[in-house]
Amino acid sequence: GYSSAASDVYKRQLLQYVSDTFPEITSLLYIINNKRNDTITDLDVYTFKGKDHIFEEMEGLRFKIGPKSFYQTNSEQAYNLYKIARDFAGLTGNELVYDLYTGTGTIANFVSRQARQVIGIEYVPEAIEDAKVNAEINGIDNTLFFAGDMKDMLTQEFINQHGRPDVIITDPPRAGMHQDVVDVILFAEPKRIVY
């Protein structure tokens, strides 16, 4: 193995090579993961170059995206996907929409202009902070965002407190939705579910 100092030198050389080879990269961040899995929520993020976030734009909206926040990797296709989701939601401006697994609130904020109110729920607290910032920088005042494990957040009590959704938009992680979440969605009886 390498010493910590040697490892540091190699890391800097690699990052500098990436930065020099791809000058179009405006922000370059890295994480050191010595675990046997690829989760990063419990790891520190280091900025090598640029800012600790990027911005994406669609339909005049700006979205701040941090390193621990989920965002579709293909921005152009993300935009097409969000337009289709919005169309499937059939919004008229009067609906209460729940955006489950909202990430940085991109879909929630994207559909907010066609809804009465949008509530976004996400597991990653940093992503929810980005979602709130995204609503603020876009002048959106009809979104609410909550951080926590979906099965603990989306309960019958939550729905009783915040209202029965007319539409649920859900983009769960690969593992899918916990059965408790599915049960609460069935309890909520939304007119439409966009999955």
List where the protein language model places each region:
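Single conserved hydrophobic/aromatic residue that forms the stacking wall/gate
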Residues: 1-6, 10
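Rossmann-like S-adenosyl-L-methionine
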Residues: 12-195
